[in-house]
């Protein structure tokens, strides 16, 4: 029988369960695909819940898209009988202007996860290795496995940060990509400018360095690194960013990579044609207007200030919270993770548990955050 993933208590999956009658397929699946863990999204509210639910499980912005962006989506949807630009030329040009790079260096796609998958597909062969920090974004090892490579997980430091020397030490002749996430999802910690420079400089030039900066807009630490500042001197560097977080466009699915033109062309060659739909392209391009960017910066600053307030309150309650620089915070409670997530759920708050490791809680509205703080205080009082 073909092994299939089975659910675990945390909602993640483990390989090894055989296909059952309920699987309904007699098709021979690639063994490595059959063994993949399923990506687990943040929990969604139950419409039948008797209490008001605060969804703090997916790192979404609590604000809707800006009015001008919604209007652009509506206008574009009226032309949905036509295909969009195949590689998002208009959006690509706008991004190149925004970041001061060449158009040929920009690749847009259906969210940053899809682009990370395309990058790995372009450079990895079966048996190759990809070095990743761990715990980090849940999709990384899945993308690596789909590309036929092997994820080499380098544990975070005790303060939930990337261990740059250990990541560099993990590089072997089979390494094709070294991945970093700053701020790191789910722990919220950053790579400083010095650490980022050390990482990029220490990776051989034939190995790709992928830096995922999905949450960069929320960073307030002046020591934080910015991968784009290293791009000119590092032809193997790829910077990943998204419109899902600060731009409030998670439902549109638009991300982009910036790298040297030859690698960008290779990534496009394995990407799905017309991969970003027409309304999504229009939304993202509009979000890059000067007025829209200014409003996004204001919103991001407000989220960061609220994050700092919440983290300070949690520490006052007695929680150990790592440096938080995204729009979320991390409670590394280990074996108590499942119980803490259930405690929050009972209080009407959906969070993202990682069984045996900790709970990630997104920053929501002030009201939602106050409810989360009250639930956290109640847990501390009982434990």
Language-model segment annotations:
Residues 122-180:
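PLP-dependent aminotransferase-like
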Residues 2-82, 383:
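N-terminal "arm"/small-domain region of PLP-dependent enzymes with the aminotransferase-like
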